[in-house]
Curated annotation (Swiss-Prot):
Keywords: Chloroplast, DNA-directed RNA polymerase, Magnesium, Metal-binding, Nucleotidyltransferase, Plastid, Transcription, Transferase, Zinc. In plastids the minimal PEP RNA polymerase catalytic core is composed of four subunits: alpha, beta, beta', and beta''. When a (nuclear-encoded) sigma factor is associated with the core the holoenzyme is formed, which can initiate transcription. Its main location: plastid. It comes from Guillardia theta. This is DNA-directed RNA polymerase subunit beta'. GO terms for molecular function: DNA binding; DNA-directed RNA polymerase activity; magnesium ion binding; zinc ion binding.
């Protein structure tokens, strides 16, 4: 298969026309034969264990099961590449083509796409300007809809008729002296398709724009909603009739595999059962139409075909959910695509990438704002190519194999080289869900023991992280451009403001707030001890470290600075030599005879002194 390198700006998901669906599955073989249509519900032959021709696993349509080998075994080996076997009609190719080659089913009757019928808002209902209930009545063969009222005064365009009402009109229509002409009614997806075909989008959009200027209230809202849908159809150049399926795509067989288990039984994807139901009903409808079966039987078969296609696209969206073995609902195409475990979020957006790791985060209060603690074991694995390069560059080993052996032995020199390698090499930390750009930031790694990533507590609000078991992913920017970009744009200190509000996002939270509160909190159970006097803050901290006092013990400590205190004096004592002692609730002042301050003691706790020292050190102030 030739590889094509093509750059693109975006991926657009759009409605597919029947011709495009056919084009996906239809292929012209080198011998001129056109293949692609799946006509049989069979999967594999249970005696030969080979796929049935024209079935859901057909090798002629989807490609060979074994590399470079046709179905009958006439051609084997890569030298026959591109040859189509005359006996079985299978093209000799790689088996991996079965992962991308599609097929299609030509439906005997049109069916509505359940997403456009049953999703809210219902696009078919909005476009036709018919209530959803009424559209469903028509689609599932409960009511008729007037597609042409003709000259009948009692009928109007898009009017719903019951079975009895239509029979009464039909009787009048086929009478010899009947004056009724041009009356047409329809039922099922065919009728909806005809109504959609009758809509001229450009004309309808123009008339709605004029209507919006005149009408008010609910009618205006309804018209705006309808105009928006019509404008989208015009903008994407989509035909409304494409919401009615006449050709059904069949996804590649290797995306809905069938595997043999040890006991000889087979495990298969639910999609195969759902496709088989569609094919059985489609083939039965074709046979009934060929033998000119009564209308009521054909109509019932068309309804069953509609329900089987609904179940294939979105099982359970409408009507009874199709169950498999053990009374378990079968997984439809929608179930495979949507949700956290779906194809987009699990496999496409959530891919595992090289040079990345994941671990629990713990608080690292000793880190700088631009640093994070990276476990040594993880760092060695992530930076291994850089370490190997450095070991060879320094002449410590001769080749990659020897370097890997050295790393496996955990030699001391390896850790020294790792320290050198991570210097100035930023790493990216990401916490899911990444709801804004600050969910992924760059840090300079610091090697730490253990297996947890250490995170600076100030960056927690940006990541919306806490330390109750949260995990974060680590990514290594490899190229110099990526490293420069991470350092210049993504480093944590440069992401100070929230991009949403412009307010500071680097602020104390979680453990920091709790720690500050705990340090400064008062303990009512602790008694003010008049005998605990200290000459300075250092003595208090020494007493705390030697466990003579507790973190919340009240102490009197000498302090000669200014104290802003509005407390009233509770007692005044006269001392020898006309000296005075002024006692306040939280301080004691000793004054000389001229009222000059001699000494002052303040009431505090070791916790408050600790916080005070940290604040003053960070502000680079001294007493």
């Amino acid at each position: 298969m030739s590889k094509l390198e093509q750059y693109f700006d975006y991926v657009k998901i759009n409605l597919a026309s029947p011709q495009r669906i056919k084009k996906w599955g239809e292929r012209r073989l080198p011998n001129g034969q056109v293949v692609g249509e799946v006509t049989k519900p069979e999967t594999i032959n249970y005696r030969t264990l080979k796929p049935e021709m024209d079935g859901l696993f057909c090798e002629r349509i989807f490609g060979p099961v074994k590399d470079w080998e046709c179905h009958c075994g006439k051609y084997k080996r890569v030298r026959y590449k591109g040859i189509v076997c005359e006996r079985c009609g299978v093209e000799v190719a790689e088996s991996k083509v079965r992962r991308h080659r599609m097929g299609y089913i030509e439906l005997a009757a049109p069916v509505t796409h359940v997403w456009y019928l049953k999703s809210l808002p219902s696009y078919i209902s909005i476009l036709l300007d018919i209530p959803l209930k009424d559209v469903e009545q028509v689609v599932y063969f409960n009511s008729y809809v007037v597609t042409k009222p003709g000259n009948c005064t009692n009928l109007r365009y898009k009017q719903l008729l019951s079975e009895d009402e239509w029979i009464a009109i039909e009787d009048q229509l086929y009478q010899e002296d009947s004056e009724l002409t041009g009356v047409e009614v329809g039922i099922g997806a065919e009728a909806i398709q005809k109504l959609l075909r009758d809509i001229d989008l450009e004309v309808e959009a123009e008339s709605l724009r004029e209507e919006i200027l005149v009408v008010k209230g609910i009618k205006k809202d309804k018209s705006i909603k309808r105009l928006r849908v019509i404008d989208n159809f015009i903008a994407t150049r989509s035909d409304p009739t494409w919401m009615i399926l006449t050709v059904l795509p069949v996804i590649p067989p290797d995306l809905r595999p069938m595997v043999q288990l040890d006991g000889g039984r087979f495990a298969t994807s639910d999609l195969n059962d759902l496709y088989r139901r569609v094919l059985n009903r489609n083939n039965r409808l074709i046979r009934l139409q060929e033998i000119l079966a009564p209308e009521i039987i054909i109509r019932n078969e068309k309804r069953m075909l509609q329900e089987s296609v609904d179940a294939l696209i979105d099982n359970g969206r409408r009507g009874r959910t199709v169950m498999g073995a053990n009374n378990r609902p079968l997984k439809s195409l929608s179930d495979i695509i949507e949700g956290k475990q779906g194809r987009f979020r699990q496999n496409l957006l959530g891919k595992r990438v090289d040079y990345s790791g994941r671990s629990v985060i713990v608080v690292g209060p000793q880190l700088e704002l631009n640093q994070c603690g990276l476990p040594r074991e993880m760092a060695l694995e992530l930076f291994q190519p850089f370490v190997i390069h450095k070991l060879i560059q320094q002449g410590l080993v001769n080749n990659i194999k020897a370097a890997k052996r050295l790393i496996q032995k955990n030699e001391l020199i390896v850790w020294n080289v790792l320290e050198e390698v991570i210097q100035g090499h930023p790493i990216l930390l990401n916490r899911a869900p990444t709801l804004h750009r600050l969910g992924i930031q760059a840090f300079e790694p610091i090697l730490v023991e253990g297996r947890a990533i250490k995170l600076h507590p100030l960056v927690c609000p940006a990541f919306n992280a806490d330390f109750d078991g949260d995990q974060m992913a680590v990514h290594i920017p490899l190229s110099l451009e990526a490293q420069a970009e991470a350092r210049m744009l993504m480093l944590a200190p440069y992401n100070f403001l929230s991009p949403a509000t412009g307010d500071p996002i680097i602020m104390p939270s979680q453990d920091m707030v709790l720690g500050c509160y705990y340090l400064t909190a008062e303990n009512p159970s602790q008694q003010v001890n008049r005998s605990l006097y200290f000459s300075n803050f250092d003595d208090v901290l020494l007493a705390y470290e030697t466990k003579l006092i507790k973190l919340h013990s009240y102490v009197w400590v000498r302090f000669n600075g200014n104290v802003d205190d509005d407390d009233e004096k509770i007692e005044e004592k006269k001392l020898d030599g006309n000296k005075k002692l002024h006692i306040y609730p939280s301080r004691i002042k000793k004054l000389d005879q001229d009222n000059n301050l001699m000494v002052q003691y303040i009431l505090t706790t070791p916790g408050r002194i600790l916080l005070n020292n940290v604040l003053f050190d960070s502000l680079q102030l001294q007493f």
